[in-house]
Amino acid sequence: MESQVAAAGAAETEAEAGKRPAMGSASQGSLVSAPKGAVRWQLLRQVLKQKQLDDHLRHVSVRRFESFNLFSVTEATKKGTEKEAGVWVQYTSIFYPKYSISVRHNSGSLNVEDVLTSFDNTGNVCIWPSEEVLAHYCLKHSHIFRDLAVCELGGGMTCLAGLMVAISADVKEVLLTDGNEKAIRNVDSIIACNKKTGVFKTPKISSRVLRWDNETDVSQLEGHFDIVMCADCLFLDQYRASLVDAIKRLLQPTGKAVVFAPRRGNTFNQFCNLAEKAGFSLQRHENYDEPISNFHSKLKKEGSDIYEENLHYPLLLILTKTG
C-alpha cells in the first residue's frame, strides 16, 4: 500500500542522509549521487501529477524495502462509505495468528502543502518496517504492558504497534498519537471500527494529535504513562531533541521507553546521546528476535539491492527514566 507521497518523502530523506558528512556512514556515498538528487524531484512531480511511480523511481526510494514478513495482509470487507479514501486491510500476525486487526490504508492523494509543510508525513500512508517490528515485539512481550498506561508516539496513519498492545495485553490504557491531524483522523476510524468487533482488551483506547515540540500537547499528559514507544522517529534533526524531552515528560518517574529505529547514518547515535544527557539509562540491542535476525542475515547474504542495513534494520533501544 505504498503511496506516491511516502515514496517522495522517503527519497528526500535518503538524499539528505547521503549529503550530510557528519552522519559518518561508510555506505552513504552509494546512497545518493547527482542523478538520484534529480530523481527526488521526479518523485515529487509524480505526486503533483498523481501518477504511479515507475520501477526506476521506486528503486531509489528508501521505502523500497517494505517488510520483515511478520504480518499477513489481506484485503478486508469494505468498512466505510464509497466517498472515503482508503482501503481496509486485515493485519494478522504470522507468529501469533490469533492476533489480527483491521486497519485503513490511505489510498488517496495528499496535496502539495501536505507534502512540503505538514508535520512529518513519513508515516502517513504506509507502515514502515520499524513499525512492523515494534508491533511484533509488542505481541511477543505483551506481558510487560499488564496494568500499565501505554502511549505510542509518531504512530502514523495506523499506529499498528499500539493497536497490537490493545488487542493482546491486559493493559490499563492505550493512547495512540501522531503529530499529523489527517493521520489521527484515520486512527480514530480504525479504533471505532475495531471497537465494534470487541477485539480490544481495554475499553480505554483513544487517539489524539500530539506534537513533541508543542508545550500544550505534552504538558496535558505529563507524567501519565508507564511505557512510551515509537518506531523510526529519530531521523528528523529538527524534532530529535523535542522527542527526547517529550518522552521524558510523558513518563512516570520509573517509566520506560521502547524505541525501534535503524541507524540512518549517525541519527540513532545522536538520539542516544541526547537521551543520556537527559538522564535516561540506555540498553541497546541488535539481536532481539531470532526470526527477524535470521531474515536480516538472509537479506545481507543475498546482497539484495532493495535492502540496506543502515536504512532498514531497526535497532532496539530501551530508555529507563532515572529521575
From Swiss-Prot:
Entry keywords, A to Z: Cytoplasm, Golgi apparatus, Methyltransferase, Nucleus, S-adenosyl-L-methionine, Transferase
The protein, known as: Calmodulin-lysine N-methyltransferase
PANTHER family cross-referenced by the UniProt entry: CALMODULIN-LYSINE N-METHYLTRANSFERASE (PTHR13539:SF3)
4Fe-4S among keywords: no
Low complexity bias: start-end ranges: 1-12
Family the entry assigns: Belongs to the class I-like SAM-binding methyltransferase superfamily. CLNMT methyltransferase family.
GO annotations of cellular component type: Golgi apparatus; nucleolus; nucleoplasm; protein-containing complex
Subunit note: Monomer. Interacts with HSP90, probably as a client.
Functional note: Catalyzes the trimethylation of 'Lys-116' in calmodulin.
Catalytic activity: [calmodulin]-L-lysine + S-adenosyl-L-methionine = [calmodulin]-N(6)-methyl-L-lysine + S-adenosyl-L-homocysteine + H(+)
Residues covered by region (Disordered): 1-31
Record-level Gene Ontology MF annotations: calmodulin-lysine N-methyltransferase activity; heat shock protein binding
GO term, biological process aspect, one: mitochondrion organization
SUPFAM superfamilies according to UniProt: S-adenosyl-L-methionine-dependent methyltransferases (SSF53335)
One family name in Pfam for this protein: Methyltransf_16
EC number(s) given by UniProt: 2.1.1.60
Tissue expr: Detected in most of the tissues examined, with the highest expression in the brain and muscle (at protein level).
